């Protein structure tokens, strides 16, 4: 099972599991296809969108654990 951190790049996250995209879109991260977002960390993206990065990482890791089980 993959585990991500605040320093994981959005592009890397989407390579780990593309099924995480709807989770990100539902919280307002609509720029997943933007070239610049691919080089942004989860923490940077969370901060731009006013989201707690630690909570987001926990939510993503919970999702990955279930999706990749």
Regions found by a protein language model. Name each.
Residues 1-69:
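Domain-level signature for proteins that mediate thiol-based redox and metal-cofactor handling
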